[in-house]
């Protein structure tokens, strides 16, 4: 089943957010279940339509279709399960039944109403093997899957209130309905999306510029993922501000570059996650999505360009994949060049994220040819203001940094 380009996946943008006047009456008397982290972020993204056509967490039929056929029960392409897990003991203690509505809360504030349509179990090893191509627990996505509780609750979610987004993320929070209007106002008839979880070096910059040329796009939408962090990752503040300064410093014109955030916890599902990213950016209003080497990969679980090949095996999802190889520095050409264009193969120098990170860790400004000085300055400023002195996630950051989103009280 294929729907039209420029329309949301499934043809209709989901938006399930209560009017503030309705909220007190709708949540009165509901059983409450506290949630955190991944579940909070997915609830917000579901309610605002980032994951259209999903209106909530999947039931068994959808999970089964996604796991085995890479599609929803309705027939639309979908590649990654979205589930809400709960231990049977908790289900029994709260006397939760199919047909009930429960209130999920975050930090003791109302988050979403979950209308329970189904309570079911699923083979987590089967799920992991099909989605990630492995059942090895050293794969982070497999560990996440095995960490789910023994039961799942499927059903629609409705956001109780608009979330509060803290600085510096507030201006980058643009739900699909808002972002689509902004892209239309910019006149972006052809928008190419860039998925990232990194501070940009010039290899990333040229990946974006190359995709812009290749797709004949009107603009580039940089859409960093904000989700679970591990020690050693770049802090989210450095990532999103570093991406934004590329435009502010003139490396992209004001009218061809924009940044917005996506609440999503990476699954590292390689080619399957590439399909998921394409669908989400389609919902944001993009017509194209760039995919470079090792997209959404981890370790050596996937081939370098598996995320390219998968689009030849699935039905058209309504967004054009822009498949790019590698940009690197050539000392003979004295500049950044593209795989297959430059003839100095023996001289090419690949961008090393680990080397760049070690230079930044020492507080040394890398050569501008591989890392823009304005990006470095913004990253170091973010380290001081948000990272307790480090541009990388530390144990202190994990313990003390405030969540990117919180929920307000519901006024009666």
Would you name each region that the model predicts?
Residues 1-412:
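Active-site cores that bind ATP or allylic diphosphates and position pyrophosphate for catalysis
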């Amino acid at each position: 089943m294929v729907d039209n380009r420029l329309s949301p996946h499934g043809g209709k943008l989901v938006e399930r957010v209560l009017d503030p006047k309705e909220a007190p009456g709708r949540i009165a008397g509901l059983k409450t279940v506290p949630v955190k982290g991944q579940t909070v972020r997915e609830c917000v993204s579901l309610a605002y339509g980032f994951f259209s056509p999903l209106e909530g967490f999947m039931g068994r039929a959808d999970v089964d279709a996604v796991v085995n056929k890479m599609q929803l029960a309705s027939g639309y392409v979908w590649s990654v399960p979205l589930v809400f897990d709960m231990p049977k003991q908790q289900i029994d203690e709260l006397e939760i039944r199919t047909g009930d509505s429960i209130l999920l809360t975050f930090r003791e504030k109302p988050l979403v109403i979950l209308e329970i349509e189904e309570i079911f179990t699923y083979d987590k090893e089967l799920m992991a093997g099909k989605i990630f191509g492995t059942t090895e627990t050293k794969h982070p996505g497999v560990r996440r899957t095995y960490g789910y509780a023994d039961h799942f609750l499927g059903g629609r979610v409705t956001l109780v209130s608009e979330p509060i987004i803290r600085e510096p993320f507030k201006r980058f929070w643009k739900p699909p309905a808002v972002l689509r209007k902004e892209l239309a106002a910019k006149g972006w008839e052809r928008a190419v999306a860039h998925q990232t979880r990194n501070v940009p070096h010039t290899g990333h910059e040229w990946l974006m510029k190359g995709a812009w040329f290749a797709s004949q796009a009107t603009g580039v939408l940089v859409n960093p993922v904000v989700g679970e962090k591990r020690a050693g990752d770049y802090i989210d503040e450095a990532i999103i501000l570093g991406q934004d300064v590329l435009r502010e410093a003139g490396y992209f014109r004001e009218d061809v570059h924009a940044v917005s955030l996506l609440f999503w916890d990476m699954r590292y599902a390689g080619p399957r996650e590439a399909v998921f990213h394409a669908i989400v950016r389609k919902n944001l209003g993009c017509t194209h999505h760039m995919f470079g080497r090792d997209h959404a990969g981890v370790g050596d679980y996937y081939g370098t360009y598996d995320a390219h090949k998968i689009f030849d095996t699935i039905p058209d999802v309504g967004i054009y994949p822009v498949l790019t190889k590698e940009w690197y520095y050539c000392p003979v050409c004295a500049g950044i060049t593209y795989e297959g264009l430059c003839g100095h193969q023996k001289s090419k120098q690949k961008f090393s994220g680990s080397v760049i990170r070690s230079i930044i860790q020492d507080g040394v400004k890398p050569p501008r040819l591989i890392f823009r000085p304005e990006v470095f300055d913004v990253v170091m400023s973010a380290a001081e203001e948000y990272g307790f002195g480090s541009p990388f996630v530390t144990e202190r950051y994990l313990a003390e940094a405030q969540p990117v989103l919180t929920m307000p009280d519901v006024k009666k």
